[in-house]
Amino acid sequence: MTRWLFMVACLGIACQGAILRENSARNLKNSLKVMHEWKYIDYDFGSEEKRQAAIQSDEYDHTKNYPFDVDQWRDKTFVTVLRYDGVPSSLNVISEKTGNGGRLLQPYPDWSWTKYKDCSGIVSAYSIAIDKFDRLWVLDSGLVNNTQPMCFPKLLVFDLNSSQLIKQVDIPHEIAVNTTTEQGRLKSLAVQAISSVNTLVYIADNKGDGLIVYQNSDDSFHRLTSNTFNYDPRYTKMTVEGESFTVQDGIYGMALSPMTNNLYYSPLASRDLYYVNTKPFIKSEYGENKVQYNGVQDVFNTQTTAKAVSKNGILFFGLVNNTAVGCWNEHQTLQRENTDMVAQNEETLQMIVGMKIKQLLPHIVIIDIDNIINDEYMLVLTNRMQKILNNDLNFNDINFRILIGGVSDLLENTRCTNFNIQNDDSDENNDDSIRITIDASFN
């Protein structure tokens, strides 16, 4: 058993956990620890009577609820659930209550936002992102059952301090779909918050082979095309733990580097990694002579899914066939020899669909014997998508998980270690810091 230090610090309204590995040996199987797990997704309906009524009316069917993205802010952990018939709420937080399937979800901001048939609420929250101004950005695809258009796709922005809607913007049809093929499904989201006004949002259309740029300052949209967005017919078949499925999806998972302003992305049905520098978009320059797409084909030995970039420029990505999290240091040449794995587990890492890199709150530090460490941590959501698509989920098994791990621990002794960039965020003289260490053991 590996001994970990588990720290929880509270400031009345906020509690946050962080995990720090004590030894330096690489243990890929246990480098990410399970934070939450579910056999099936269930909700806090307020009472068992209301839950049974939701079941009887087909509002809730536990076999149709599949988590898709995760993020965290203070004491709130957000989970999105794709809107299928039988899904009562698409945007949720994890409650303190536990049901037979696992922790119960609560709709966010409240149940009124779950009413979607008149398009006033949230239809299907595919992806979410929280920026440095405490805003939650929500990409609502407007789709039911993953294919049926119910409403226009839209962006919603919530003030997390008040849980109030700040802005809602419908995405025009000619932006949301490929007007040549009339195909479109908006899936991945990345937010670049330069200021509270000057904020750009990048949205991937993985069926219409497009990248959409939204500028918050003037509510403008721009749709970009590139052959780097297209899926590769050679890699449409994916296999997870011996179970195969086929997809023809373009961009799946994007991540923005805070160091280089590179937006990294990969078509799901590919083994490629591409990037585009976002500085032209910041200047509202979208011409072909201004925007350059770069990358390497077949740089991975399998398809990749969700992505995230650390503050020091380490790109993390889900590796499908490997049931693993990989890494690459953007300060190194983009080639397979410079990639590595930081976590691998055949049971817990089946289809990584959500990934976030989070900063510890400024008033929270981890104390490890003689050292005070401020660090980033990673959140990973897995949902066994292969079984969802093949309709063979066993709801007596654990199917969905959120895992957590410290970034510096994950990177230790890997090819992705950044030797030239030091973490200067620690402040041992910060009298306002709360320093609480609780020993905990994990099997």
From Swiss-Prot:
Give the tissue specificity: Found in and secreted from the hypopharyngeal glands of the worker honey bee (at protein level); expression peaks at 12 days post eclosion. Expressed in the brains of adult worker bees peaking at 12 days post eclosion (at protein level). Expressed in the spermatheca of adult queen bees (at protein level); Expression levels are higher in mated queens than in virgin queens.
User: Which cysteines link up through disulfide bonds?
Assistant: none
A GO cellular component annotation in the UniProt record: extracellular region
Localization annotation: Secreted
| Sugar-modified residues | N145, N161, N178, N321
UniProt keywords (A-Z) are:
Glycoprotein, Secreted, Signal
PROSITE patterns attached to this UniProt entry: PROKAR_LIPOPROTEIN (PS51257)
The protein's matches in Gene3D superfamilies, at most eight in alphabetical order, are given as: TolB, C-terminal domain
Q: Where is the signal peptide?
A: 1-17
Question: Which signals induce this protein?
Answer: Unlike other major royal jelly proteins, not down-regulated by the ecdysteroid 20-hydroxyecdysone (ecdysterone or 20E).
Concerning InterPro entries, the annotation shows:
6-blade_b-propeller_TolB-like (IPR011042), Royal_jelly/protein_yellow (IPR017996)
The organism sits in which domain of life?
Eukaryota
What's this protein's family per the entry?
Belongs to the major royal jelly protein family.
Q: What is this protein called?
A: Major royal jelly protein 7
